[in-house]
Amino acid sequence: MAQMVAMPVAHSLSLICNWAKSNPLSRNTLALPASNTPNKQSLSIRCARVGGVEIPANKRIEYSLQYIHGIGRTRARQILVDLQMENKITKDMAEEELIILRDEVSKYMIEGDLRRFNALAIKRLKEIQCYRGVRHIQGLPCRGQRTKNNCRTLKGKKIAIAGKKKVSK
């Protein structure tokens, strides 16, 4: 039988669970299994690593691939079609299938390479001082959205400006 450890708890917990009547220990303690007891049923959770990212093991491949930056719904479906692979749960994949999936994903620009590419593209726009580059520099939207009322994400928090005060005579 597992060892038990007594932990102090609030009176309300013992009253809610009606635990105080059956407890051989004092009224303010709660017995829990000791943490140093060995667990015979070890739980093994295997996360697959694809494209430098640990994708969730308990989801289908189509949705797991979307955790990789640069792979969305369409690209994930296209990868499965190209490999002629069924959309099963990630942890049920064989090691060979995982290797083939890694090879296919590595053909695309993902994660750090994609982020670097986008950052360099924005930097180039800023250097040539085109309209989009200037809007990036100013921290404003560059795709034609109105800025009078919205675009708080780019402009930041609203700053209160003191208006004209009426002078009392």
UniProtKB/Swiss-Prot annotation:
Keyword Ribosomal protein belongs to the record: yes
Keyword S-adenosyl-L-methionine (UniProt): no
Gene3D superfamilies, per database record: 1.10.8.50, 30s ribosomal protein s13, domain 2 (4.10.910.10)
GO biological process, one term: translation
Matches recorded under InterPro entries: Rbsml_uS13_C, Ribosomal_uS13, Ribosomal_uS13-like_H2TH, Ribosomal_uS13_bac-type, Ribosomal_uS13_CS
Keyword tags: Chloroplast, Plastid, Ribonucleoprotein, Ribosomal protein, RNA-binding, rRNA-binding, Transit peptide
A Pfam family this chain is assigned to: Ribosomal_S13
Feature: transit peptide: 1-47
Molecular-function GO term, any one: rRNA binding
Cellular component GO terms held in the UniProt record: chloroplast; chloroplast envelope; chloroplast stroma; ribonucleoprotein complex; ribosome
Superkingdom as given in the UniProt entry: Eukaryota
Record localization: Plastid, Chloroplast
Function: Located at the top of the head of the 30S subunit, it contacts several helices of the 16S rRNA.
Similarity comment: Belongs to the universal ribosomal protein uS13 family.
Record's subunit section: Part of the 30S ribosomal subunit.
Name under which the protein is recorded: Small ribosomal subunit protein uS13c
